[in-house]
């Protein structure tokens, strides 16, 4: 069983939900980014998504867009993020997933990128702009390297398309809570529960919810309908505040840990 599968199996056996934390690789710089990843793990994150910065991130909200810009300005790119994953893997046993747009992968070459991602210790890959109709090559290659290709589905995804996406998935299903870009929100739309229920009827894979999750009450609202929640912008905002307000590093790491622990307590 893969590391991702093991985490969700353990969570299910204890009646708990997985807390998946997102961070942009190289934000605000590579050295501190590694410290952030280790802090997320120590605070209780069950799985960590590491974003690969890209200049045209269509699915990212303003907070994560700015994180990508900071990472790019600090010299982070595919090579650096793969090295970051490798450094994190030397110290951590939890699953690490790369979230990347398709373009950087194509620039390196699909097979080469997947080979190096697996060699660095990644467990899976999320490609937000990969259409299911064009994903066969990547899906087959990823499986050959032991990498899960984790798809995104939304409330607006049609039923036939949803069935096709879910049928080809591995790792877990990433359900998007809203149509649009990432970012913390005050509330979640009612159709989120319908989406989660629908997806769970179609697959035995874990079903997780992201986009807009950042408050304990949101997790309490939806946790009975999913296997995990994904928190991104609410954590990245803390890093942005560090940069803008010149906070002490230790204080930032403390705030990140507290946020994870607070969300973990209700998951």
From Swiss-Prot:
Enzyme class of the recorded protein, top EC level: lyase
Pfam families assigned to the protein according to its UniProt record, in alphabetical order: Trp_syntA (PF00290)
InterPro entries on file: Aldolase_TIM, RibuloseP-bd_barrel, Trp_synthase_alpha_AS, Trp_synthase_suA
HAMAP family: Trp_synth_alpha
Active site: 49, 60
Protein's pathway: Amino-acid biosynthesis; L-tryptophan biosynthesis; L-tryptophan from chorismate: step 5/5
NCBIfam families to which the protein is assigned, alphabetical: trpA
UniProt cross-references to CDD domains, sorted A to Z: Tryptophan_synthase_alpha
Family classification: Belongs to the TrpA family.
Catalysed reaction equations from the record: (1S,2R)-1-C-(indol-3-yl)glycerol 3-phosphate + L-serine = D-glyceraldehyde 3-phosphate + L-tryptophan + H2O
Membrane-spanning parts: none
Alphabetic keyword roster: Amino-acid biosynthesis, Aromatic amino acid biosynthesis, Lyase, Tryptophan biosynthesis
Listed name of the protein: Tryptophan synthase alpha chain
Gene: trpA
Lineage: Bacteria, Bacillati, Bacillota, Clostridia, Thermoanaerobacterales
E.C. numbers: 4.2.1.20
Molecular functions per Gene Ontology: tryptophan synthase activity
Function noted in UniProt: The alpha subunit is responsible for the aldol cleavage of indoleglycerol phosphate to indole and glyceraldehyde 3-phosphate.
Gene3D superfamilies reported for this sequence: Aldolase class I
Quaternary structure and interacting proteins, as annotated: Tetramer of two alpha and two beta chains.
GO cellular component: cytosol
Keyword hit for Protein biosynthesis: no
